[in-house]
């Protein structure tokens, strides 16, 4: 009797099918047959349309808004693949929803990022891949391998192509928590670093107290992982411009863009904003430029499949 060959199969939910198609095309394969629909009462119905027994499977599904719908789709897809005897189930979550709920900021707060990690693991995921986790300590919430991929190489490449870094420039971290991300960006480009000192009196509100570093007369490139309402981003751009920056550019990995964020950015001091396609958006204004994560995710998936190093992707 012939033994079935262990193949790689890539699945996608409904959260960002466009990105999943780009990733599969980069790898040189097709998306596996899977239908994620709804029953009449709204319950999620997953139908796997081909065999996965003994195969290495990858599910591409960011848990972006509507976060609970997309997370539940992902969990049910994992369960379906596990019960169909997949050899491995790697979940590729470009944007990890609930990542900002990673600690108890005050009494009786939940740590929802940990809860999501538990749900993914119990459902049957054997590996998680994500991009620019909001808090790196979330990696410790998992008892299965987690690959936190960095987006800075693709943004740095795009900035060079668009000649943004031909002028005198500075990489700006919008807060102390993002310094490591901004420093990696600055090291990749070989440029200086500035840091905004800010505090948050309440959720989605930030007050800038000081700018550490020189921005006067320079192209300031703000590097951040998430733009939700974009109030913090717009305020940062305003403060930088008031300090004499020649122009302000932004690089944002995860464009949540809720609560009027697009209009807010349009009317801000930001000249150009580069975003990834971790979250799908359509009909964006010309000020927005989308940089695809597909090559990064595709390369990482291939390396996981072949048991090759992933960290080499982020070395100089």
Curated annotation (Swiss-Prot):
GO MF term list: ATP binding; kinase activity; magnesium ion binding; ribose phosphate diphosphokinase activity
GO CC, alphabetical: cytoplasm; ribose phosphate diphosphokinase complex
Binding of Mg(2+) 2, residues: 175
Cofactor(s), by name: Mg(2+)
Annotated coiled-coil segments of the chain: none
EC number(s) given by UniProt: 2.7.6.1
Primary residence: cytoplasm
Subcellular location: Cytoplasm
Residue sites binding Mg(2+) 1 per the record: 134
InterPro entries: PRib_PP_synth_CS, Pribosyltran_N, PRibTrfase_dom, PRTase-like, Rib-P_diPkinase, Rib-P_diPkinase_bac
Protein residues bound to ATP: 41-43, 100-101
Protein name, as recorded: Ribose-phosphate pyrophosphokinase
Organism: Thermosipho africanus (strain TCF52B)
Organism lineage string: Bacteria, Thermotogati, Thermotogota, Thermotogae, Thermotogales
